[in-house]
Amino acid sequence: MLPLGLSMLGESVEPEAALEERFGFNSFGAATRWVSAVLEQTWGLTALECSRMAISDQNAIVWVASDRGGLVVKWSRATERFANLEASTRLLSALAAQGVPVPSPITSLNGLDRETLLVREILLDRETLEGPSCAVSFTVLPELAGEWLNVQDHAAVRSAGACLAEIHRTLGATHVDGSVFSSRSTGLKERIGVWLENFDRGFAPDATRRLVDLLARVSELDDQTRLVHNDFRAANILTRNSQTTGVLDFDDVVIDHRVSDLAKASVYLGTLFTDWRPTPIAVRQSLRAGYESVRPLSRSETEWFEILELWHGLMAIPGENDTAGWASAL
């Protein structure tokens, strides 16, 4: 669980300074009073307590106790992503309606899953409250039960793998406008080749040589791209009694190959907000076993899995000061 009050997700900056610089609030209390006012006036919900707030880049998350139970309130000031966020929120509603364990957005009084808030000031109990210093895209989700995935629990990891396969299957059958989502339409051989030529920093030369060799011998992946989660890892997976109870954060959904999404999840599965370490091999194997219990990989996907896992692993190396051992894990 994140600490009470205000905190940062994965950034080593003072949260109070970030809150004021990015959103214009001079205190945690000012921000939570504004959240309470928005919930009352735009969603018809009564906030009883706002216990936690976390800032990540241009985004904020607030945990709220309300008359409708626990809520997770999310907003973003990244205006260039507003259309994408609206689409991903609609996608959440569609997935929840089909039984996928995701938080189903709570509809506002205007009948919307997500609202763009432009008004700087808002009135609550005859008190004028200062809102953010910018337009924000705002959504309200129910808080799901569970704890973040513990990758030492292999049964929970297998359950997470099975859940990812179910998400891929459901996304493939869900009719949504994919035009706003980023698309990885270039062939994998070309994408990886361009990365090797222009972006490989040489931190794991043996792994790079292995990737070059594997890439030279494989045929192009025989699979269509489709919507995938793109950030499936411990920080976005909730479990209870070794079973997946919730998958969070569909804000980074892209159009890509499912096996690439699985390979990326294998590499990053154990990462939380400030604890970034490579995923042990046994854990990766459990994730894949769980996935294939629902959707077995094709022969072409099986050939590509090792290549994609190696590529995502190379991209994960933070730099020369690799204290967590990402390079040695390859």
Question: What residue spans do the PLM features occupy?
Answer:
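Active-site activation/catalytic loop segments of kinase-like enzymes and analogous catalytic loops
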Residues: 259-295, 309-325
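All-alpha amphipathic helical-bundle segments outside canonical DNA-binding/catalytic cores
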Residues: 297-309
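Conserved NTP-binding catalytic cores of kinases and kinase-like/nucleotidyltransferase enzymes
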Residues: 1-109, 240-243
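Active-site acidic catalytic loop and adjacent metal/ATP-binding pocket
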Residues: 54-68, 72-73, 105-107, 215-260
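A cross-family kinase active-site recognition segment
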Residues: 148-203, 223-225, 255
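ATP-binding pocket architecture of kinase catalytic cores
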Residues: 66-176
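Short Pro/Gly-enriched beta-strand edge/turn motifs at strand-loop
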Residues: 40-48, 191-192, 210-221
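A glycine-centered beta->alpha junction motif in the catalytic cores
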Residues: 111, 134-151, 193-198, 311-326
